[in-house]
Amino acid sequence: MFAVIQFPGSCDDRDMWFAMSSVLAGKCSMVWHQESELPAGTKGVLLPGGFSYGDYLRCGAMAQLSPIMGAVKRFAKRGGPVLGTCNGFQILCEAGLLPGALRRNSQLVFVCDDVHLRVEKRAEPFSSRTEKGAILTLPIKHGEGCFYASEMELGLLEQNGQVLLRYCELDGTISKASNPNGSLGSIAGVLNKEGNVLGLMPHPEHAVEAAFGGTDGIAILGSLLDMARSA
């Protein structure tokens, strides 16, 4: 079972629930941020996009103090998979579960578009349904999605193979034009060192049906589901 965490201001929580339960036939439950424990039998945690607490102070800064985040941290420490998309990525960084930070987009405007992403590695539990070098197309919608980290942190991310997704051209080429927000290294998605926590700015939950944005999001969400079913 997957736990979809709901914060005040979340707006993609139901989309995530729909993608995982209705489209992929997984079992999901909504968990309010004031809860102090995850439901029994939780196999994965999903932190959705939106504007938790209205993005006051910094995106994710207040949400990371919610009671449920203590349980999320304990779950991650035990090796449980945690996925944060968009605002969920920001929350994971603020909570110290992922390195780096998400800053204002380099052009200082909100971006809403489809982007191409290059898969940098095939690994459980987030990319077992795809291959290294594969190109995914997913939507983005954010104003603070510029991934930033110190030079030392960036070096460690690359050295440890923690970069899972990069913004790219359709042919996989990395370019300034294909980077929608100025993220360092064109980084779109990063893992923790252990590989069980992933944050990404694009929205896989909005790309699970051919009639509505394509199905490339299944490569990520389906990989999580495969892990849960085999556990």
Residue ranges and their predicted role:
Residues L97-L184:
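Pocket-forming structural segment of enzyme catalytic cores
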Residues M1-T85, C93-P99, N105-V111, R118, ...:
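N-terminal beta1-alpha1 cap of cysteine-dependent amidohydrolase-like domains
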Residues L200-P204:
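Glycine-rich phosphate-binding loops of nucleotide-dependent enzymes
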Residues S52-Y53, F89-I91, F147, D171:
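Glycine-rich nucleotide phosphate-binding loop and flanking beta-alpha elements
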Residues K132-I135, N192-V197:
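Beta-strand-turn-beta hairpins that frame and shape the catalytic cleft
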Residues L170, E205-A207:
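Short Gly/Pro-enriched loop/turn and capping motifs at secondary-structure junctions
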Residues L117, G189-V190:
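A structural signal for short hydrophobic beta-strand segments in well-ordered beta-sheet cores
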